[in-house]
Amino acid sequence: KIELNSKYPAYDIKLYKNKKFLSSNIASILSYIATFVVTTIVNSNFQYVRGFDSQLSGLILITFPLLMAIVAPAAGKLSDRIDPQKIATIGMIIVTVGLILLVPLDKDTSIVIVLASLALQGIGYGLFASPNINTIMSSVPPKDTPMASSAVATMRILGQTLSTGILTVIFAIMMGNVIIQPS
């Protein structure tokens, strides 16, 4: 309530009245909730279920951030010429396909399927992230871009935190107090 009435709020809640700003921030937090735990789940599968060492797991897992780092700059430039929301939507569709590939993940899931999933997620997230941030930043007046940037960071941290919390609760419910060890 104090922030709403402040002349110079630390975090301007009023920005969320802007539908484009709100929807793009919701998309951001949902994307982090959906994708942040993938590394933990796949790494646990590799090391504790399949018995891979951490180096091999890391080499496979680098697929996602590597492809994201390659695609994101191009997607950012493209989003200056084409509707960024369309690019971001295509990116999230690709991420969703990648996540669906991991639904049946177990000890017998082909590494090719896991790599395809990570590749799709990296490409999709690369297509999503920069255009979505472009949408958020361009949806506010120039004087509010510092606040919009804070919102982007807040959604990222909140999404990652919620993602980890949800995974922890799921692990606790499904496994109880069992010690996780390589098989």
Report the location of each language-model feature.
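Short, membrane-exposed interhelical loops at transmembrane-helix boundaries
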Residues: 182-183
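C-terminal membrane-cytosol helix-exit motif in multi-pass small-molecule transporters
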Residues: 1-5
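12-transmembrane solute porter fold
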Residues: 8-178
